[in-house]
């Protein structure tokens, strides 16, 4: 009997697929483990260089002045990200909030934001003012900031000629590394570099801004090391390692990070304020563990992609592809299959496993969404989770996985509930 069936009731045909997938995935698992080892040693070196001590994890209250623990964590982030400086704060509520702070920090009335990799994902549309519902709520457009975009080509690659044409009129060039709700691969670092080089050749003063959500530690470099001026991400995704309870980060050029700090706090205050309360230990520990946790999440993705491919689905990316974020997307085919897949992920989660996800409205999204997230941290996507909008072709987005053993069990149960019903 498979060890899996000691704990969950899987059908023989599902276990047969599992056995084949595990064999096919081994070379790709080993590749990710090599990336993990490189990034973990880079992380260790950054901690040592900063001379972080146990007292740096104690936290501060009130204004948070002279918080050496906060300063050292930001120094570690900057070194690991290949950046001059970083802003790492628990006051960032989500990836969208962190992106909004950064964009408002960089842009002024009359400036133009160029989305060089097509329309950003749904929640950022509201920040910009593209969804038509937020007029008067303080969007970028409300403040006289213009928006332009270079749509992706039919094959989901950047349109470099269009970027060259549009970059001279823009102050910020926005690159979204992950796919959002598109069935494309995440952009690799070579593509990010080419977009950055193309925009900068047309406008040497343009600021290259990368939404790095879901992409940290999937490769041995980060976007600042290939031409980005600023990168932004969330601590309840990759860099929090499943341990950081909240927060986000902005890293890059020192002058730009300072502008973002003025927006988060107040002009004249910048990075000097922001108490850390009881969060430093979890933020330090989560970041330290992040390379290993991201490896487990990518191994989960590789395994899920292989299983889905054996079922005749067409996941993006494929298990044998290079991985540049932790997300897998595939067309579930029907609403029932999408809901069943999410319910299977939820049933094999450590938290709220008894819940059965159902479609419901979600702030920032135009369609009802079904979402599974049995996570220790609410909304965490480095923990195994999946979601999808209730619209044809019922595309499902799977991400995360703190450890492969448990995530494998969840993927199997999801596939069984979606495609092997009695």
Indicate residue ranges for each PLM-predicted region.
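Conserved C-terminal alpha-helix-loop-beta "cap" of PLP-dependent enzymes
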Residues: 309-422
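Conserved PLP-enzyme active-site core in the AAT-like
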Residues: 3-26, 33, 43-56, 65, ...
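Short glycine-rich or small-residue beta-strand-to-loop segments that form or flank ligand, phosphate
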Residues: 60-61, 87-90, 326-331
């Amino acid at each position: 009997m498979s060890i899996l069936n000691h704990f969950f009731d899987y059908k023989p045909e599902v276990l047969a697929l599992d056995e084949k997938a595990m064999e096919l995935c081994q070379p790709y698992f080993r590749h990710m483990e090599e990336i993990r080892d490189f990034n973990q040693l880079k992380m260790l070196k950054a901690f040592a260089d900063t001379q972080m001590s146990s007292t740096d994890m104690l936290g501060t209250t009130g204004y948070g002045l002279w918080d050496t623990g906060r300063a050292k964590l930001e120094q570690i982030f900057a070194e690991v990200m290949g950046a001059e400086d970083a802003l790492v704060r628990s006051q960032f509520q989500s990836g969208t909030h962190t992106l909004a702070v950064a964009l408002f920090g960089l842009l002024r009335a009359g400036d133009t934001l160029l989305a060089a990799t097509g329309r950003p994902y749904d929640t950022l549309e509201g920040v910009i003012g593209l969804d038509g519902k937020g007029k008067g709520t303080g969007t970028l457009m409300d403040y006289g900031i213009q928006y332009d975009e270079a749509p992706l080509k039919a094959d989901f690659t950047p349109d470099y000629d269009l970027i060259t044409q549009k970059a001279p009129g823009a102050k910020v060039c926005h690159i979204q590394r992950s796919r959002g709700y598109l069935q494309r691969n995440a952009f690799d670092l070579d593509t990010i570099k080419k977009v950055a080089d193309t925009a900068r050749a047309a406008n040497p003063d343009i600021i290259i801004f990368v939404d790095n959500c879901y992409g940290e530690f999937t490769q041995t470099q980060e976007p600042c090391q290939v031409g980005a001026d600023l990168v932004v991400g969330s601590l309840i995704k990759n860099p929090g390692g499943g341990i950081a309870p909240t927060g986000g980060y902005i890293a890059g050029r020192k002058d730009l990070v300072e502008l973002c700090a003025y927006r988060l706090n107040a002009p004249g205050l910048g990075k000097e304020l922001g108490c850390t309360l009881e969060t430093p230990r979890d933020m330090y520990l989560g970041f330290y563990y992040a390379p290993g946790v991201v490896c487990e999440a990518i191994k989960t993705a590789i395994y899920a992609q292989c299983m889905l491919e054996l079922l005749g689905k067409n996941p993006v990316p494929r298990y044998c592809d290079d991985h540049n974020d932790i997300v897998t997307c595939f067309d579930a085919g029907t609403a029932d299959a999408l809901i069943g897949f999410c319910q299977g992920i939820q049933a094999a989660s450590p938290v709220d496993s008894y819940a059965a996800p159902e479609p419901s409205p979600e702030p920032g999204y135009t369609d009802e969404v079904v979402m599974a997230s049995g996570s220790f941290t609410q909304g965490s996507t480095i923990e195994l989770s999946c979601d999808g909008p209730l619209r044809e072709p019922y595309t499902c987005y799977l991400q995360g996985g703190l450890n492969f053993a448990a995530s494998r069990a969840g993927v199997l149960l999801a596939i069984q509930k979606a495609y092997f019903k009695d």
